[in-house]
């Protein structure tokens, strides 16, 4: 039996025990450390002015499951990663000089990290660490310590939260108002861990003799200047910021032997594409977002709205017609209570917006909305916002308590009226240790689970316990990291006992050209044993993400994260500071031969072997606003898929080229 061969349940229990113990141990950890790491450069050139693109705002591009690549942090080469810089690491011969806002030159080297990503590209991703870098530190240790404390408290961005350009801009504005700050900017970097980002605040201090509180910052923006050079900022002052949103994408996609060359068995409709199918997709998302303070109080209100137009030109692998669709994408509002110097922060928002829990194992920001049928651009996946959300977030130092209500934006022909309620307790010490415990319930849903006798059980009443643990560095070894997560599912209306989880180990090689990184992940999701009275098939909920939980760009289209195990090996290199190449190998196999609830052709498996897939992703940042991405994949059907089609199958080849824009 597969469970016995691979020790799945034993591994899952280990993840559970490890995560829960970490939660209890860390809950009583002291809070003596600063909330953000700090480092001091020996010598540097002063910042002349914060970069314009270091203060981006609003809901923008979120690359879809079929095109977003896994985050991988560049490791030290000529420059060092944000979280590891110290005074001795910064060469005085390589000053961190920043160009003026009008500069068109390439971003200069800085002592924080190699690969910098646009703030809007990282929106919604978990923050692994927050780093504060003082370029011209004081010679007085006590004054320096106090400056760092005030910078961390004023910025307000904490490790463990989900990155928001809107709130990062608000925090930067607070930092720039400090009497000892000459100039400041924040930057966003990839992490060596998958699916998380690092935030760096870069600050230049005023001379010690200059300490007066600055006057109000003159308003700026297109409304004030009437000039296009201020795009996308409409209006910015000390307490307010309003920006235009303009996201978009265009791509060419080509599949050879879609549905493993046998659409009669595996395609979700009567359309049967054969041979090579090539088509184009596009989308455009204009909108508006802003934040403003209420008087001199610590209360801020914010919101955003956008409209997405998408299209598919020529037949794709789902339908024969060209189609175009437009609808509201984001429409949300909220308020933030954040008093400078107070570790207690509260944030409440509601409406159409994105949401991601942890690394997307149960809830991914790419699965909030369906992108099929009439909505067009299925591979580009431009729609990600949930139809309705209510999100609350309470933070105190290293601790975070999050509550959420979610209602996915499903297709009308397949609307299950599913609603999710959840609460999550998190500890993140900004030193590489994160422990999370989450509870999720489903108070409403018409979706059902199919049993061998034809009976159906409803998803309504489903409950999930979800612990998670992340360690970086592992055992104090630079570049070595670990992630583990587990989910136990039960239902208060009938006997259900399903489980899923993963163990993920990775290593980023230090001080080597191209900064290679390696990782291995074993993941498992239980299937239902028809001989027991308990229902055991795992429900993947809203998991997604091309290099996270789709588990194969082609295999994932015919087999989801239920009744399956997978081995995944990743190898990533970065030939230069703007270019990343990532190669993934997946091998997937089933837990049980009973697969009711899966693809109609795979309801009863004749083998545990599901298939293999190789996935190559290349990303090249043309600038802080444009990304060129290429994807290539070849999926080989396993014995179970071949036998379901009477051995009439072929490898499924996918090629994609996309250009994304985000302002």
Segments and roles (model prediction):
Residues 1-12:
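N-terminal secretory signal peptides that target proteins for export/translocation
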Residues 3, 28-300, 518:
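N-terminal periplasmic/intermembrane-space "pro-region" immediately following the signal or transit peptide
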Residues 15-27:
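Bacterial N-terminal signal peptides
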Residues 256-265, 312-319, 360-367, 406-420, ...:
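Outer-membrane beta-barrel translocator domains and adjoining extracellular loop/strand segments
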Residues 485-487, 495-574, 578-582, 589, ...:
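Extracellular/periplasmic loop regions
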């Amino acid at each position: 039996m597969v469970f016995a061969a691979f020790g799945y349940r034993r591994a899952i229990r280990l993840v559970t025990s490890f995560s829960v113990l970490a939660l209890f141990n860390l809950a009583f950890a002291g809070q003596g450390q600063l909330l953000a790491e700090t480092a001091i450069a020996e010598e540097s050139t002063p910042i002349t002015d914060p970069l314009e693109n270091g203060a981006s705002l609003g809901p923008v591009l979120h690359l879809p499951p079929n095109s977003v690549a896994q985050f991988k942090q560049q490791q030290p080469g000529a420059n060092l990663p944000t979280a590891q810089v110290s005074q001795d690491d910064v060469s005085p011969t390589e000053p961190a000089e920043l160009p003026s806002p009008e500069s068109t030159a390439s971003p200069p080297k800085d002592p924080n990290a190699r690969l910098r990503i646009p703030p809007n590209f990282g929106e919604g991703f978990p923050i692994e660490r927050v780093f504060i870098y003082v370029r011209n530190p004081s010679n007085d240790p006590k004054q320096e310590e106090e400056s760092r404390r005030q910078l961390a408290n004023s910025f307000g961005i904490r490790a463990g939260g989900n990155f928001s350009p809107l709130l990062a801009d608000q925090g930067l504005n607070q930092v720039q108002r400090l009497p000892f700050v000459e100039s400041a900017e924040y930057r966003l970097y990839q992490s060596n861990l998958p699916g998380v980002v690092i935030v760096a605040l870069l600050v230049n201090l005023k001379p010690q003799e200059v300490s007066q509180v600055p006057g109000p910052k003159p308003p700026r923006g297109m409304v004030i200047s009437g000039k296009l050079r201020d795009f996308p900022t409409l209006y910015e002052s000390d307490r307010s910021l309003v920006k235009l949103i303009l996201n978009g994408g265009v791509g060419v996609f080509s599949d050879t032997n879609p549905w493993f060359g046998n659409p009669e068995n595996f395609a979700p409709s009567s359309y049967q594409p054969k041979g090579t199918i090539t088509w184009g997709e596009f989308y455009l998302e204009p909108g508006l977002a802003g934040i403003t303070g209420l008087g001199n109080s610590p209360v801020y209100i914010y919101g955003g709205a956008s409209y997405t137009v998408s299209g598919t030109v020529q037949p794709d692998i789902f339908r024969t017609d060209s189609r175009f669709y437009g609808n509201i994408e984001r429409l949300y509002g909220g308020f933030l209570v954040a008093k400078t110097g107070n570790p207690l922060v509260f944030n409440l928002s509601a409406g159409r917006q994105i949401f991601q829990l942890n690394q997307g194992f149960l809830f991914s920001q790419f699965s909030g909305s369906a992108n099929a049928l009439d909505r067009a651009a299925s591979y580009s996946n431009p729609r990600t916002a949930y139809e309705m959300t209510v999100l609350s977030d309470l933070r105190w130092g290293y601790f975070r308590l999050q509550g959420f209500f979610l209602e996915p934006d499903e297709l009308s022909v397949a609307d299950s009226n599913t609603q999710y309620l959840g609460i999550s307790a998190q500890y993140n010490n900004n030193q590489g240790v994160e422990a999370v415990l989450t509870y999720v319930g489903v108070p409403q849903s018409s979706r059902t689970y199919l049993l061998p006798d034809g009976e159906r059980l409803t998803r309504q009443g489903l409950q999930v316990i979800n612990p998670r643990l992340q360690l970086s560095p592992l055992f104090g070894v630079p570049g070595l990291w670990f992630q583990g997560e587990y989910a136990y599912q039960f239902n208060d209306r009938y006997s259900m006992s399903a489980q899923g989880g993963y163990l993920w180990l990775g290593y980023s090689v230090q001080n080597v050209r191209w900064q290679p990184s390696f990782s291995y992940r074993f993941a498992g999701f239980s299937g239902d044993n028809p001989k027991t009275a308990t229902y055991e098939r795992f429900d993947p909920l809203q998991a997604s993400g091309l290099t996270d939980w789709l588990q194969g760009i082609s295999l994932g289209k015919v087999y989801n994260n239920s009744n399956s195990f997978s081995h995944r090996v990743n190898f990533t290199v970065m030939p230069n500071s703007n270019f990343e190449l990532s190669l993934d190998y997946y091998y997937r196999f089933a837990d049980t031969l009973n697969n009711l609830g899966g693809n109609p052709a795979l309801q009863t498996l004749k083998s545990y072997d599901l298939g293999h897939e190789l996935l190559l992703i290349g990303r090249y940042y043309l600038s802080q606003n444009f990304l060129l991405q290429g994807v290539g994949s070849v999926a080989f059907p396993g014995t179970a898929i071949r036998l379901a089609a009477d051995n009439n199958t072929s490898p499924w080849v996918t090629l994609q080229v996309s250009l994304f824009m985000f302002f």
